[in-house]
Amino acid sequence: MLRKGTVALINPNQIHPPIAPYALDVLTTALEASGFEAHVLDLTFHLDDWRQTLRDYFRAERPLLVGVTCRNTDTVYALEQRPFVDGYKAVIDEVRRLTAAPVVAGGVGFSTMPFALVDYFGIEYGVKGPGEKIICDLARALAEGRSADRIHIPGLLVNRGPGNVTRVAPPALDPRAAPAPSSSPSPSPAPSSSSAPVPVPLSFAAVGHHESRAWQAETELPYTRRSGEPYKVDNLRYYREGGLGSILTKNGCVYKCSFCVEPDAKGTQFARRGITAVVDEMEALTAQGIHDLHTTDSEFNLSIAHSKNLLREIVRRRDHDATSPLRDLRLWVYCQPSPFDEEFAELLAAAGCAGVNIGADHTRPEMLDGWKVTAKGTRYYDFADTERLVQLCHRNGMLTMVEALFGMPGETLETMRDCVDRMMELDATVTGFSLGLRLLPYMGLAKSLAEQCDGVRTVRGLQSNNASGPIVLKQLHQCDGPIEYERQFMFDESGDFRLVCYFSPDLPEAPGTADSPDGIWRASVDFLWDRIPKSEQYRVMLPTLSGSSENDNNYADNPFLTSLNRKGYTGAFWAHWRDREAIMSGATLPLGELAEAVR
């Protein structure tokens, strides 16, 4: 088959343990189906020579388009606040020196602030949400020789000059898209080309917030997953060095939790993948020796009928084919406390599920109200659902991790203490407690705090380790455009990093902490460590401040995780958390059915 041209796809992530850039397999599948050659340049395994790797490639190849995936903007860990976008920019700057090909960025992290990042990176294009269809349309336009002012692809973000990024609206917007603010909006800056789309009044709807992106996703084809092939994602190497493979069953989320980026970044409707396509992909991965697969859905049990059907197909193939590689599958899933019934638990176990990570977040109903909600704003579970889920998992032989997140508005010592005590009573395999919330522009909580600030005042609890003064957020319609609105959550007025976070000012901190823009909630961290008896801390993940503990529960460059991988353990890292001290000390532990040495 004669190829129409080459698209280079770059993974700039250099965080370890490594996580396979699943998105690049998705894009590669779509581009190849559309007649293009896709070359993956994976810099994760080139920490010291990534510049030379890029130089060698672009000296030999002339791609018509370069795509860059940005999985995370930062660690999103409020007690650390470590940005990644500066590293991505360094990679992009090097690419710009080596090729004249236009650059398009995407990825879930990118999608949380796409206008600001197109501007910050100085690139031509961006994609918010699933990118497999849009990148093919863009590659096709470039292959046809269309000039920049003739490229109007629905969903594509276009850089029209410094401080001026526009988005080509899809032909039919979600009717539930957020309405324009009632106050008079500022107009978008005029585009530089008269043939560009006419700007619409600045509103959340105008920038594509609260919009379905199901039309952007490929749902019927199995994504091609490879190992050991040049210029492709090496999934087996990632498994050997990172301990997990990945599988997506659906995109988007119909829920509206106030501290979540999924409905905005991936869309407000589920784009459910075909059952056969997903299970074919899982079978291909396990056949390559990648036996531990973790779902990458926002939550696996949302749209539970689809998830049950998928599990039934896995079970059918495992039971009816003695040679099926799915018999070696160990599945790890993210779930919300509800919906989750006995049938679902039994299907998970029969399909080879090893563990369930439960995003319970809290036990108190007054904390969950307005936080963990449906699109209509109603809470969709209570703590009894969490209790039942843990019991069902343990009854069916599956490990559990239950997570709580402290620091939302209204959090007090009483609510935090009660949550700790009740979650410890669950006797989950591991219980994880986090403190503080990293704010991203289109979260419900972030929009609410911007509304309270109204561009003229700060709000107690707004915090950044690098803040040099009070943090005053503007609402979208008060900004010159979406770039300014999004940037304020990552940068200060001088352009320096200032990752904006939130900690409840009602927690018992030292005087002045909640009123200080760079205050550190030390007393709350200390309380959590003191509340858990030392005899129970082996099964608990606790928040840490720099230097406060060797048991850091943040993923990026985590010494425990990297030690696990060097020793050949696989599966979700929390499954080995109870044995962390022995593993870190170098003790040789028997490798059970939930941990396998990759040979």
Curated annotation (Swiss-Prot):
Concerning Pfam families, the annotation shows: B12-binding, Radical_SAM
Ranges for domain B12-binding come to: 4-149
> Which intervals carry biased composition (Low complexity)?
168-181
The cofactor note from the UniProt entry for this protein is: Binds 1 [4Fe-4S] cluster. The cluster is coordinated with 3 cysteines and an exchangeable S-adenosyl-L-methionine.
Q: Which GO terms describe its cellular component?
A: cytosol
Keywords from the UniProt entry: 4Fe-4S, Antibiotic biosynthesis, Cobalamin, Cobalt, Iron, Iron-sulfur, Metal-binding, S-adenosyl-L-methionine, Transferase
UniProt KW Metal-binding keyword? yes
EC number of the protein: 2.1.1.106
Job description of the protein: Involved in the biosynthetic pathway of the antibiotic thiostrepton A. First, TsrM catalyzes the transfer of a methyl group from S-adenosyl methionine (SAM) to cobalamin, leading to the formation of methylcobalamin (CH3-cobalamin) and S-adenosyl-L-homocysteine (SAH). Then the methyl group is transferred to the C2 position of tryptophan (Trp) with the concerted action of the radical SAM [4Fe-4S] center, leading to the production of methyltryptophan.
For this entry, the protein name equals Tryptophan 2-C-methyltransferase
Q: What is the organism of origin for this protein?
A: Streptomyces laurentii
